[in-house]
Design a protein with these regions (language model features):
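Cell wall/extracellular polymer interaction/catalysis modules
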Residues: 1-76, 80-91, 182
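Exported/periplasmic cell-wall-interacting domains
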Residues: 7, 46, 50-53, 72-191
Length: 191
């Protein structure tokens, strides 16, 4: 899983970059006009927490963001995943890391996370840890984002998928408390 990567190209005109998300194929297409800059598999929202469809723009970018409500309660050596309102009395709370956050709607964004072969997020778009830094560099605040059930590019872009992260063991919960998870990303290389 950690070795998975996809080629990416830098744009000639960053103002012409566009992002299209296919919910049915769980794919992101980053384009500059007719030129494909990056095609990547992602995980999108599940049935109960769907990724919103529509036309958006990137409104905020933050390389090291933490969630405000979901995360980890900890006390001494004990750590457990929870919502902030469910943390045990007397325990501290640290929001879940959301590296390479690119927000397109309040509370929704692209970020690093486990990419699974089925819709499974809380509505955001999860990117593979090796592809998130590439995406982050390609988009800017103001980049248009179109999210729909399908995209025209779906018919033309087949790609090998990373192994399904579903059955993989998660990292130790303590990794999410510090900065270790933010440091897992490869330095992006472009064609």
């Amino acid at each position: 899983y950690q070795a998975y990567d996809r080629p990416a190209f830098l744009p000639v005109d960053p103002e012409a970059v566009r992002v299209r998300v296919s919910l049915s194929k769980q794919r992101v297409y980053v384009t500059e006009g007719d030129h494909m800059l990056l095609v990547m598999p992602v995980s999108v929202g599940g049935a109960a927490t769907p990724t919103p469809s529509g036309h958006f723009t990137i409104v905020r970018k933050q390389e090291r963001r933490r969630d405000h409500s979901q995360g980890y309660a900890y006390r001494g050596n004990r750590v457990k995943q929870c919502l902030i309102e469910n943390r045990p009395p007397g325990w501290s709370f640290k929001g879940a890391p959301l590296p390479y956050w690119c927000e397109f709607k309040p509370g929704y964004g692209f970020h690093t996370g486990w990419v699974k072969h089925h819709p499974c997020t809380q509505g955001s778009v999860r990117m593979h840890e090796n592809l998130a830094p590439k995406f982050f560099r390609l988009v800017k605040v103001g980049t248009p984002v179109e999210i729909s059930y399908s995209q025209p590019e779906d018919a033309n872009h087949r790609m090998p998928l990373p192994p399904d992260a579903g059955p993989l063991p998660d990292y130790p919960e303590t990794m999410y408390l510090g900065d270790d998870y933010f440091s897992r990303h490869m330095t992006p290389a472009y064609q």
